[in-house]
Amino acid sequence: MTTLTISIIVVFVLGYALIATESLTKVNKAAIALLMLVGCWTLYMMDPMQYLQLMHPDYTGGAAGMVEKVTGIIQEHLGDTATTLFFLMGAMTIVEIVDQNGGFNWVRKVMKTKSKRALLWRIAFLTFVLSAILDNLTTSIVMIMILRKLVTDHKDRMVYASLVIIAANSGGAFSPIGDVTTIMLWNKGLITAAGVIAEIFIPSVVSMVIPALILQTMLKGELVMPEVSAQQNASVSDFTEGQRKAVFWLGVGGLIFVPIFKSITHLPPFVGILLVLGVLWTATEVFYRGLHRGTDAEGTQKRVTKLLSRVDMSTILFFLGILMAVSCLAEIGVLTALGQGLNVVFDGNHYLVTGIIGVLSSIVDNVPLVAGCMGMYPVAAAGDMAVDGIFWQLLAYCAGVGGSMLIIGSAAGVVVMGLEKITFGWYMKHISWIAFVGYIAGIVCYWFIRTFLYAI
């Protein structure tokens, strides 16, 4: 391993450490990710020929065509990254449109009950389902806002909020559009929508149901329902009830339609998400036509042109930085060597490899972990490493569900931590072991299905 290769690895590891300790450094992880991107590729360009000879042995252009070749490599990686970024931007915008225009109002009505345990199960399954359709971050925000209207006791709400984290991560693991990591794997063609839903659905349910069974022992009695003011009920007044339902079904139904669109047209998933965004945008413009005409009413601030500014661009830039930095590691051969090393150490046991990756995803960000694995292991024509093979499906499950073990291990956990003021220590003491039990139970369930049911 050359000094230059070691330098690139040091830049990546240092950046990774700063991202993992964002809560301590108070430096936004997107800024660090962008610096990682630039730092890694700048070092790469100091002597790209050694890496071209290593990773592209068919290259014969010599020094004269070196810059052009490297530029093409970077553009190819950027193209792959852009498909994920456009998908995320489209999905985030769609959810923002539905939320801001009252599309989720019906959820609060569905959740109403006096029994604490009944509410827990409604929260668990609704969060699970919504997270499979939306992203787990948005689902968590929506569910916490609903919980605040239903549960007044903060101690009880922390238990419910913890279940929201677990259910959101479990629900996102089996859906090709439910979590950033599954989006990455699906977008890359490593898993299919039908395959991951069919084989990861039951383990995901198990990883949510078992923690819910344990958590319900912490809740007894009935809820004291808070009063809902007329002003709160009238928070969304621009659209009629029918129009709000139309916005919901166009948005959420459209997200469900994306995998179907991909299977019919064979176009990348981001094309389907842009189709849904275009249709939903057009529909809301038609609904707003004639409303607040000639005025500066507050409702016009909910039009898509205004809502676009609310999309979290720092998240998009974070993924750009991470994915492009990981692509640099792939181009210097580090990921291939690491993947071979893991196979040797664990003797090719994919359950152990992915299980450890899942535990690591609760400590550090799962996006670079999954991106790294995508670069470490080539897709095989058949076997465990083939499309929809054991390794890729387990990676989708472990990277998603594993993030529940620590409150900082997932985007859902971080946002709930901030909204409900749950401390790292409280979650680790009361919830982490419960999430771990569910995580292991899901892996065992997957092993049982693959070993015994598939053998019949």
Task: Describe each region flagged by the PLM.
Residues 6-15, 26-62, 81-93, 244-254, ...:
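Hydrophobic mid-bilayer segments of alpha-helices in multi-pass membrane transport proteins
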Residues 43-76, 92-109, 129-141, 328, ...:
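Transmembrane alpha-helix boundary signature
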Residues 1-4, 24-27, 55-59, 67-84, ...:
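Interfacial loop-to-helix junctions that mark the boundaries of transmembrane helices
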Residues 40-51, 78-79, 130-167, 171, ...:
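Membrane-interfacial helix-loop connectors
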Residues 4-7, 153-154, 158, 174-175, ...:
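Juxtamembrane and boundary regions of transmembrane helices in multi-pass small-molecule transporters
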Residues 60, 79, 101, 108-110, ...:
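Transmembrane helical segments that form the transport core of multi-pass membrane transport proteins
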Residues 79-89, 195-213, 265-278, 352, ...:
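Alpha-helical transmembrane segments
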Residues 6-9, 34-35, 85, 120-125, ...:
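Hydrophobic alpha-helical transmembrane segments
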